[in-house]
């Protein structure tokens, strides 16, 4: 087969795949992403860059998984806060019954407007999520966590009873039903998940996530969250350095890693990630332990430089503008920044009765990466 014929055959195959399986099912790693994907920022500039489209795509399923106390819930709550800042409505399905309102509020979540459910069974939790998403009035739903969505038969049974594959079947059935509704209503669905170890695995990674394979298949984005090291102030531990790896991404090339500081009681340190990204792009100069900007020293050591940025918002904003430009991340739209009430009115139309198709909420869209 000639070179031109091979190229034509490949293009025909790619078009057929996209027609059969949807946009983003296959792509060249170096090509530009779809600029029409509507997104909401994750609350972390580094994660927005790693995701490749400037945030979480609307109408898609996202899975966040990792070991215990790695920062999974923190990452999800930052997404909730960002949606609420843009006039959106958020729902939180707390299957673990471990929601901390004070911590969520510290991260920027409007607790008074957050819709919270603490279901008794997995079926109840997923049915509540389905009803909320189907209403067209919800912009983001967080399920915390998949492992805690216990099937009714297991709840009502005796300790020690065998329920092989019951939760996997529940998740498979629920996701088949939810995926289409999520896409139509442009809702972001975030499923937090734990990790387990497969017994008898001698080679390869023994870790897996509970709930079967369905969530892995239906997720547009899968994020693996792991602690890298502790952050100390003198001898006191004040936070954790966390790595967020994009292990699956159907809207941009995957396998990128974002490193963030999660500070106890504060969430993701935006000044810390801004400093790291600016230093990587030579926007902020780093010589030894000193950080400087436009020839002026802003701190000796990373923590002092972070503190300087927190105390000088004008400098921080100027650096952030340059970092966004360097990484190709859009700032929020002028409409959202200047007229938030208008955005709220547009979002309210989604919930208006008689609408055949909910209006897509106004949100920043990603330009060329």
Curated annotation (Swiss-Prot):
Record key words, sorted: ATP-binding, Cytoplasm, DNA damage, DNA recombination, DNA repair, DNA-binding, Nucleotide-binding, SOS response
Region (Disordered), start-end ranges: 328-369
SUPFAM superfamilies for this protein: P-loop containing nucleoside triphosphate hydrolases, RecA protein, C-terminal domain
Family annotation (SMART domains): AAA
Binding site for ATP: 66-73
Biased composition (Basic and acidic residues): 339-369
Domain of life: Bacteria
Gene3D superfamilies: P-loop containing nucleotide triphosphate hydrolases
Pfam families (UniProt xref): RecA, RecA_C
GO molecular function: ATP binding; ATP hydrolysis activity; ATP-dependent DNA damage sensor activity; damaged DNA binding; single-stranded DNA binding
Protein's UniProt keywords contain ATP-binding: yes
Function of the protein: Can catalyze the hydrolysis of ATP in the presence of single-stranded DNA, the ATP-dependent uptake of single-stranded DNA by duplex DNA, and the ATP-dependent hybridization of homologous single-stranded DNAs. It interacts with LexA causing its activation and leading to its autocatalytic cleavage.
Name of the protein: Protein RecA
Lineage: Bacteria, Bacillati, Bacillota, Bacilli, Lactobacillales
């Amino acid at each position: 087969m000639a070179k031109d014929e091979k190229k034509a055959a490949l293009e025909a195959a790619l078009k057929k795949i996209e027609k059969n399986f949807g946009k983003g099912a296959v792509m060249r790693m170096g090509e530009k992403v779809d600029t029409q994907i509507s997104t909401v920022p994750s609350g972390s500039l580094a994660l927005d860059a790693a995701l490749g489209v400037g945030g979480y795509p609307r109408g898609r399923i996202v899975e966040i998984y990792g070991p215990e106390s790695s920062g999974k819930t923190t990452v999800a709550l930052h997404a909730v806060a960002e949606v609420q800042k843009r006039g959106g409505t958020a729902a939180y399905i707390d299957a673990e019954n471990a929601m901390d309102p004070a911590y969520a509020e510290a991260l920027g979540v409007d607790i008074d407007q957050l819709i919270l459910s603490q279901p008794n069974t997995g079926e109840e939790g997923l049915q509540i999520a389905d009803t909320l998403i189907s209403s067209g009035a919800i912009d983001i739903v967080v399920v915390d966590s998949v492992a805690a969505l216990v099937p009714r038969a297991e709840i009502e049974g005796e300790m020690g009873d065998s329920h092989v594959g019951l939760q996997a079947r529940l998740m498979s059935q629920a996701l088949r039903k939810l995926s289409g509704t999520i896409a139509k209503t442009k809702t972001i669905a975030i499923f937090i998940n734990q990790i387990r170890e497969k017994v008898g695995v001698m080679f390869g990674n023994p870790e897996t996530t509970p709930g079967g394979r369905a969530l892995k298949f239906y997720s547009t984005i899968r994020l693996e969250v792991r602690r890298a090291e502790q952050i100390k102030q003198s001898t006191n531990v004040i936070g954790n350095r966390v790595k967020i790896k994009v292990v699956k991404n159907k809207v941009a090339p995957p396998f990128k890693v974002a490193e963030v500081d999660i500070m106890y009681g504060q969430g993701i340190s935006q000044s810390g990630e801004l400093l790291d990204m600016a230093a990587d792009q030579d926007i902020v100069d780093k010589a030894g332990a000193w950080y400087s900007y436009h020839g002026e020293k802003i701190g000796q050591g990373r923590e002092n430089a972070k503190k300087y940025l927190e105390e000088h918002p004008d400098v921080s904003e100027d650096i952030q503008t340059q970092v966004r430009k360097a990484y190709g991340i859009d700032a929020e739209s002028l409409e959202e920044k200047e007229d938030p009430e208008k955005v709220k009115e547009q979002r309210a139309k989604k919930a208006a009765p008689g609408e055949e198709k909910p209006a897509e909420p106004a949100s920043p869209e990603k330009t060329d990466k």
